[in-house]
Amino acid sequence: MGMSWEDVVLIEESKNSGHPTVVTVNCPDKAGLGCDLLRIVLEFGLYVTRGDFSTDGKWCYVILWVVPRPISLKIDWESLKKRLVSCCPSFLPAFYIDQFSGSSKSPPLYLLKVFSLDRKGLIHDVTKLLCELELTIQRLKVMTTPDGKVVDLFFITDSVNLLHTKFGREETCEHLSVVLGECCISCELELAGPEYECQQGFSSIPETIAEKLFSCEFSSVEDGSQAIISDTSRIKKASVVIDNLLSPVHSLLQIQCHDQKGLIYDILRISKDCGIQIAYGRVSPSVNGTRNLDLFIQNENGKKIVDHENQVALCSRLKEEMLHPLRVIITNRGPDTQLLVANPVEISGKGRPRVVYDVTLALKTLDICIFSAEIGRHSTLDREWEVYKFLLDENQGFPLTSKQAKQNIVDKVRRTLMGW
């Protein structure tokens, strides 16, 4: 068709700070492509100010206006382009496919072992560097020893083919040593052995906590565990409507809701999981904190969604996950305080980007140390969840035993995750 791989993704960088950069994707279509693209955009810390999607079922055209959040965030636009190209179906010769297209097999899992002295913000500083290097945290195990030392085990995958050489692994460890400074005792990075490949879960979650965390009626303020009443009331005003009168071949899905981080990714993720095909979509700019989306959709058979039960199920699922894309609660584990964060896993098995980054940033801002942490998977009847456990360390400036302190922690963590 006279196109080269450079034309698949075009990025027109903004010349002024705060103004959006324009990202254009022009490639063959595939099911769930929009979700895959928005996932990468979210992974890079970018906020979509507006967007357009269109496809004829064979060819797809996407244009996104994006800005870094925060504005000070440095973006490697060339790396973003390569990552976006990698998830696009290719019409190119095999030579280019091997270089620029993602492989269908699972990427290798690496184990990063960090042994260091404990200090506030340690896990966030490691996580921040891993994000900058485009290394994705799949699982995490953090332990504090009685003598004040920390053993961090990060199970990571490599998005940029950095770790397949000994030099790349050593260079990554050197970067970490610089970031951690004198508190770093040792750092090792190697391929995770086969004994780690199947370890997705952890100790079971108590039934009473699981019911609260994964319930469809999840409450933002139940038992005083979350203090975001005003935010929740705004989100509950979300409107999700399906109109079958405007188009003879498509259902029009109209969404109006409170703006938040990852909103468009969440909507496209749910659409992908439910087998919804988007023929045309427009994401309007946020006005007074409210977003409007118009999506012309069909079911996986290429038909309008006319069945009332299917309409109700789709609208309910969208409203539920726009209201609670991430679940955040704080509980007591014996004498200790534990923060739990959960989010649905994509049907492809991928978790949500940057959750560890945002949670550890919020805790670092509150001057709270993490005594131990782990990431695992939990299955309920209708979906799989990624669950993050953080056992928090008591400090004199922020006593964790008070109800108000716990509410403040949940409020700060959730606001950071939602971009408020």
Question: Which residue stretches match the model-derived regions?
Answer:
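Regulatory modules associated with amino-acid/nitrogen control
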Residues: 1-420
